[in-house]
Amino acid sequence: MSGALPPSLDLARAARQTYGLQGRLPVKSLPRLTAVLASDAGEVELKLEAGLDPARRVVVTGRMDAELELQCQRCLEPVKLKVHAEPHLAWVKTDEQLAALPDGYEPLLSADGQVALKELVTDELLLALPLVPKHEGDAACGGFTKAAAATAEPDEARKNPFAELAKLKRGP
């Protein structure tokens, strides 16, 4: 079950016999994922199993864990976040199979029964990323909170932009 990871999952093989994969992928080997990260450092630990469910559907389940470095959207500094994905995928080849897919499964589209492992891992981790990556709590974004406090003070010397309109309304 462990060892070198194959380049693809063989879903046709999973229809005949359940098999599993376990291993690590370097983050830098996932270019679509690294495009949204602050750094390509780290590894993705994955454990996947492909086989038949009780309804005789070919399914892929498992887990993926990684510590990824993203850009904090509060202070714009790097932030390391643990990302976890638990895919529950079912192989579908036709629109009818897609329509009959029960809740709890996401479709895994493949005409030939081969799914590129790195693409699958990339897709699942991209979906697991937070919409707005940020540090936990305000203390970690020290530069942001100090800058925000400095700009939050009202500027007393600032003029009211509508004062000139009030003069025009009164007339000459």
List the predicted regions and their residue ranges.
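Short Cys/His-based metal-binding microdomains
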Residues: 77
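Amphipathic, positively biased hydrophobic alpha-helical segments used for protein targeting
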Residues: 34, 73, 152-153
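A positional/architectural concept
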Residues: 1-69
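Charge-rich, low-complexity linker and terminal segments
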Residues: 1-18, 43, 80-172
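The −1 position to Zn-ligating cysteines in a subset of zinc-ribbon hairpins
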Residues: 71-74, 140
